A protein has these predicted regions:
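Non-catalytic interface/linker regions that flank or bridge core catalytic/transmembrane domains
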Residues: 1-53
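Generic alpha-helical segment signature
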Residues: 15-19, 67, 149
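Residue-level detector of well-ordered alpha-helical segments, enriched
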Residues: 21, 25, 36-40, 70, ...
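Structural motif
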Residues: 30-35, 66, 97-100
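All-alpha helical catalytic cores of prenyl diphosphate-utilizing isoprenoid enzymes
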Residues: 39-48, 60-72
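Surface-exposed loop/turn and secondary-structure junction residues enriched for glycine/proline
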Residues: 53-54, 70
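Divalent metal-dependent catalytic cores for phosphoryl transfer on phosphate-bearing substrates
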Residues: 56-57, 61-63, 76, 81-83, ...
Length: 184
């Protein structure tokens, strides 16, 4: 059973589509038929907060379930871009080439930020309501680095390869997905 449990950190909950999003995420990974994939999924479901974690502390998708949403958004965007480019490309691909590329898109996009699971910590901080002049506790996200291992691209590659073998292209796509924003 790959249905993730729902955490309720700091009184927040994932949105109503949470379960269907998790099913799409898991189904896409299983569709690659990559050896070890079910073990990786089992790890994500049972040993991490991947499906309820935020994608960041304050920038993109910084809410419960944000990491799942962000990963699916990257996947859909990359898939759409790939198919648009294939239509314009004059060199047709055979079915095996298409399948290999599609599998790499699934793996690279959905797993690029896997290192953010078990990374963010939900807490609260006091914020003054400017209208009422009262202080109130609001949910706040910090982080707790339990596994320092290079930058987050390096760490994602390391975690993924504990379960599945990445192609060179997948490893580079994940490692360098921050592009110009990578710190090293």
């Amino acid at each position: 059973d790959y249905r993730p449990t729902v955490a309720d950190p700091a009184g927040t909950k994932p949105d109503e589509q949470y379960e269907s999003k998790a099913i799409v995420f898991i189904g896409a990974l299983i569709s690659t038929e990559r050896p070890g994939m079910r073990s990786l999924i089992n790890y994500l479901v049972k040993e991490t907060d991947f499906f309820t974690a935020p994608a960041s502390a304050k920038y993109h998708s910084s809410y419960c379930g944000g990491l799942l949403d962000h990963s699916l958004n990257v996947y859909m965007r990359l898939k759409d871009t790939y198919f648009s480019e294939v239509e314009r490309n004059s060199t047709p691909l055979d079915d095996q080439q298409k399948r290999a590329i599609e599998d790499s898109i699934v793996i690279s996009a959905l797993l690029h930020d896997v290192c953010k699971a078990n990374f963010y910590v939900w807490g609260s901080r006091n914020v003054k309501d400017p209208q009422a002049g009262q202080w109130k506790a609001v949910p706040w996200i910090t982080y707790d680095e339990k596994m320092p291992y290079g930058n987050h691209g390096d760490k994602s590659v390391f975690l993924i390869e504990r379960y599945i073998r990445l192609t060179i292209t997948e490893a580079f796509a994940i490692r360098f997905h921050m592009g110009e924003y990578s710190t090293d």
